[in-house]
A protein has these predicted regions:
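Active-site neighborhood of HAD-like aspartate-dependent phosphohydrolases
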Residues: 1-42, 174-175, 185
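Short, acidic loop-to-helix structural element flanking the phosphoryl-transfer center
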Residues: 77-104, 110, 142
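An amphipathic alpha-helix signature
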Residues: 21, 25, 37, 45, ...
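Short, surface-exposed acidic
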Residues: 33-41, 59-68, 124-125
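A metal-dependent, Asp-based hydrolase signature
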Residues: 45-75
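Short beta->alpha linker loops
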Residues: 19, 44-47, 71, 84-88, ...
Length: 186
């Protein structure tokens, strides 16, 4: 029976910090919000939008925060040329496909995840993709990882998770699976 390898997207398979920042900057600037890149990288990247949205647009109403997030997702593709692919991890992923089911579990949207995988020619490398739309509880909750394990009928002991962010690492640890921390890529 095949085991399971689960991969995070942002910061693990791709450095998308600049992509996400530029998309948010595009939709925030006309509204009078001007976040700095270092602030975004330090305080926002790797966290759920529900947490960092109010940091980017202080005082914005919940409806305005939802609109900002949707507009960001809509223009995300304009900045994909700023993403950096983790070539070494993709090489490992392709080798692992012989012995492992592969799953992508990301806090990002399905549309944005699909866009970046297509941009870099990696659309077919996952047996399962779970995105923000598929879960009701974001990382650090392990729900997405648990759903992937249930989908393939594997145990945490038969699973390894590749993650980079503190919230993703906490989710992987809560899931009880093996953990490979990707450091220094983004």
């Amino acid at each position: 029976m095949k085991k399971l390898a689960i991969f995070d997207l942002d910061g693990t398979l791709f450095d998308t910090t600049r992509v996400n920042f530029l998309a948010y900057e595009k939709v925030l600037s006309p509204r009078g919000f001007h976040p700095e890149f270092d602030f975004f990288r330090r305080e926002c990247f790797g966290h759920d939008y529900g947490y960092f949205g109010p940091l980017l647009a202080p005082g914005a109403s919940p409806a305005e925060l939802r609109a900002i997030h949707q507009e960001k997702k809509d223009c995300y593709g304009e900045f994909l040329d700023r993403a950096v692919k983790n070539e070494h991890l993709f090489a490992l992923l392709h080798l692992m496909r012989r012995e492992y089911h592969t799953a992508l579990v990301t806090a990002g949207s399905r549309a944005n995840s699909s866009q970046i995988l297509q941009q870099f020619g990696e659309s077919d490398c996952f047996d399962l993709t779970l995105s923000a739309e598929d879960v009701t509880r974001a990382k650090p909750d392990p729900q997405g990882f648990q759903m992937a394990m249930a989908h393939f009928g594997v145990t945490p002991e038969e699973t390894i998770i590749f993650e980079d962010s503190p919230t993703g690492i906490a989710a992987a640890q809560a899931a009880g699976a093996g953990l490979f921390v990707v450091k220094g890529f983004n």
